[in-house]
Amino acid sequence: MLYSPRLTDQILIVAGEASADLHAARTLHELQRLRPGITAFGVGGPRLREAGLEALAPAEDISVMGLAEVLPRIPRILGILRMLGRAAAERRPRAALLVDLPDFNLRLAARLKKLGIPVVYYVSPTIWAWRQGRAKKIARVVDRMLCILPFEERFYEGTGVSARFVGHPFAERPPPGPAEAYRSALGLPASRTTIAMVPGSRPSELKRLLPPMLQAAERLRAAHPDAQFVVPVAPTLDRAALEPYLAAHRTLEVRLVDGRTEEVVGASDAALVKSGTSTLEAGLMLRPMVVVYKLSWLSYAVARMLVKIAHVALVNILAGRGIVPELLQGDASPERMAAEVERLLGDRAAREAQIAALREVRASLGEPGAPLRVAEEVLGVMR
């Protein structure tokens, strides 16, 4: 079936991992409110599908991080890229909203540019950290670059990229309440020491991070017999994906919660959090945390050569200094994780200093209303 841009308000949306799926879904809701009858097709996760996206492929098929992880998936990823190009050529959407996922989305943007389809790119690639030469390609294939970090718009000055800081989607969130309120909402005992563990939204992250997190939890339980551990299950994962890891720790009390990462962190006295968007999501809850991450040896070796920033945790990057501990690769051991969490549980001055710095980060994210501003940008470029 052929779709005429004169007869339908249809847009293409592509979002990969869980955070992008959430940001895109909120934007689609705003588009539907501003332009009743608008429809969307593309690639997204459960939240985008709930918002009405016609999903042509599942988000997890293109949401892969790390060179070693990407290589075996290349045929499938390229197949989806070609499929979306064909769908765009047939349906002729009036605009495309591409969210994060730069290695995939910039290639798709180039195809869309040849078709004359305007491209709005939401969540800038981290060109300020590595591969800065991508700015030239962005200038060629992206009509509007919408930045969610306050320093990114300035970075694009002089590159030919039409960029705008729209505020961070997390700025929508109200200030956090007391931990006891979140524990009550999650059905957790209010008086027990509570430790959140946020291992990520990808199977590869679970494989590398959840086992040492659980081993660290065993060590922490020895020091805190009343401790309870809570793990949010990302919307892109099924609980069954976690079961093999939990089976090795049957005596450890671990509560799984579907989604609700901010509530899980809000319920905690301290948290172990995977590096990435999760660190900002957790940081906005103003709870002490330790950031951890592991890549394959090949991916890590490549990253060390290319990355040009001092910190990897988003809250540290925004603060301009190391306000939360970062445990990477070999340092992300059960012993180090447990020791850093123990320090945050026992050292009141360290806790208060980290929380004060996280308040500053929260204040830097701009005013609420990012989904509305993104929707207005999409409508502004529609042919």
Curated annotation (Swiss-Prot):
Xref: Pfam families: LpxB
Keyword Glycosyltransferase part of the UniProt annotation: yes
Listed GO MF terms: lipid-A-disaccharide synthase activity; phospholipid binding
Cysteine-cysteine disulfides: none
EC number(s) on file: 2.4.1.182
Residue stretches in coiled coil: none
InterPro entries per UniProt: Glyco_trans_19
This protein's pathway: Bacterial outer membrane biogenesis; LPS lipid A biosynthesis
Keywords from the named record: Glycosyltransferase, Lipid A biosynthesis, Lipid biosynthesis, Lipid metabolism, Transferase
GO cellular component: membrane
Top EC class for this record: transferase
GO BP: lipid A biosynthetic process
Catalysed reactions listed for this entry: a lipid X + a UDP-2-N,3-O-bis[(3R)-3-hydroxyacyl]-alpha-D-glucosamine = a lipid A disaccharide + UDP + H(+)
Signal sequence residues: none
Similarity comment text for this entry: Belongs to the LpxB family.
PANTHER family, A to Z: LIPID-A-DISACCHARIDE SYNTHASE (PTHR30372), LIPID-A-DISACCHARIDE SYNTHASE, MITOCHONDRIAL-RELATED (PTHR30372:SF4)
Task of the protein: Condensation of UDP-2,3-diacylglucosamine and 2,3-diacylglucosamine-1-phosphate to form lipid A disaccharide, a precursor of lipid A, a phosphorylated glycolipid that anchors the lipopolysaccharide to the outer membrane of the cell.
Protein name: Lipid-A-disaccharide synthase
Organism of derivation: Anaeromyxobacter dehalogenans (strain 2CP-1 / ATCC BAA-258)
Taxon lineage: Bacteria, Pseudomonadati, Myxococcota, Myxococcia, Myxococcales
